[in-house]
Amino acid sequence: MKPKTIIEKIWENHVVYREEGKPDLLYIDLHLVHEVTSPQAFEGLRQNGRKVRRPDLTFATMDHNVPTVNRFVITDEVARNQIAALERNCREFGIPLADLHSEEQGIVHVIGPELGLTQPGKTIVCGDSHTSTHGAFGALAFGIGTSEVEHVLATQTLWQHKPKTLQIRINGQLGKGVTAKDVILAIIGRYGVGVGTGYIIEFTGEAIRRMSMEERMTICNMSIEAGARAGLISPDETTFAYLRGRKYAPKGEEFDQAVERWRALASDEGAEYDKTIEIDASTIAPMVTWGTNPSMSTSVDGTVPDPEQFESETERNAVRRALEYMGLKPGMSITEIPVQHVFIGSCTNSRISDLREAAKIVKGQKVAPGVRALVVPGSQQVKKQAEEEGLAQIFLDAGFEWRDAGCSACLGMNPDIIPEGEHCASTSNRNFEGRQGKGARTHLVSPAMAAAAAIYGRFVDVRQLEAEPVR
């Protein structure tokens, strides 16, 4: 029997209908819903007299528009209407909802895993591009548009062309101070935002196997920034240990049986991929983006590039535009770039391990004068745990703002906006023009790098912090 990748196994297990030359009809095991991309989908059901086919395979929360201070006072009319619509729609169609009063509320891609809804072998969709986060568990997870949200609500299926397979193998061990965020930024920086276009990526190799589940989620979260349809990692003992005891995970003997099924999902020895990229983990350093897409990055000990060093006129023009928008000059050291804002949060880096890493840097320090620093936990459960562990107090003592759960400053869709022309060290996933607010200048970094930037008011190499004072 021909060896198969995990991608092939999950896909074949979910094909409901196939016709040559056309997309496959896939069954969907879990549909995650939030307030921004769902109102029109529910209205479409209502207009056509349809019900939600599987409310038991659907789970909703509110995250994008939610204020992270005074969360019950929503001043923006659009946000208020979207949140009210989600409450009404979930009531009417019988969908479970983690609303603002729920201790389970949070960013949809944080609560899915922590509640045990996300499991190996599942097909998972959500009206949000970073649904690929759930691929860390060996699930096939991808974002969909609003018309597709309606289709899944009505039928529990989705038409999809089968993408090609790309293996990205990270060999060896990461150096001190280098994180999962640096790995995915390095991949995109070296190979571009189009490297995964037309592919589903499977991340493999020793460095991946050594990562915790939360680190793996960071990697898979940003597969989309590499252009991929989805990204995933074959499940292993780390996966199973994380899921054991979670609210919606199987229990007792059923869990043991599930583990046997999940174990069989891993890509077979000798399975063929359409393309493979190999990277030596030891060559990766802490990363910082300097431009306006995630591939415009360099190591923290690097410099802002000169547009003239790029081969094509298209690239040169893109770099010139990016530098003008970001207010940077060619040849500037990354450590010279001043930072006025720091955001530790988002579906990329707002889990408990992210907050622990940031708190290690912050403990006993103070936020630099002129810097505003936010820590926004990814869920109310993460918030509670961080408070119990004393992390929240570490941040507060240093001068950080400690918030409720939500998408917050990742996107300019709620009150947490970065002012025009100011630089933000952000643990989020996108640095496009205007992403964090009109004219905001976003630099993508790891939680440790963001924490260090808050303390020093500029980027510093976290690898040096223990060895010698940087100020």
Curated annotation (Swiss-Prot):
Catalytic activity: (2R,3S)-3-isopropylmalate = (2S)-2-isopropylmalate
EC number, as in UniProt: 4.2.1.33
Protein name as annotated: 3-isopropylmalate dehydratase large subunit
One Gene Ontology MF term: metal ion binding
Cofactors named for this entry: [4Fe-4S] cluster
Biochemical pathway: Amino-acid biosynthesis; L-leucine biosynthesis; L-leucine from 3-methyl-2-oxobutanoate: step 2/4
Similarity-based family: Belongs to the aconitase/IPM isomerase family. LeuC type 1 subfamily.
Keyword tags: 4Fe-4S, Amino-acid biosynthesis, Branched-chain amino acid biosynthesis, Iron, Iron-sulfur, Leucine biosynthesis, Lyase, Metal-binding
Organism per entry: Geobacillus thermodenitrificans (strain NG80-2)
Source organism phylogeny: Bacteria, Bacillati, Bacillota, Bacilli, Bacillales
One of the Pfam families matching this protein, by short name: Aconitase
Cofactor descriptive note: Binds 1 [4Fe-4S] cluster per subunit.
Broadest EC class assigned to this enzyme: lyase
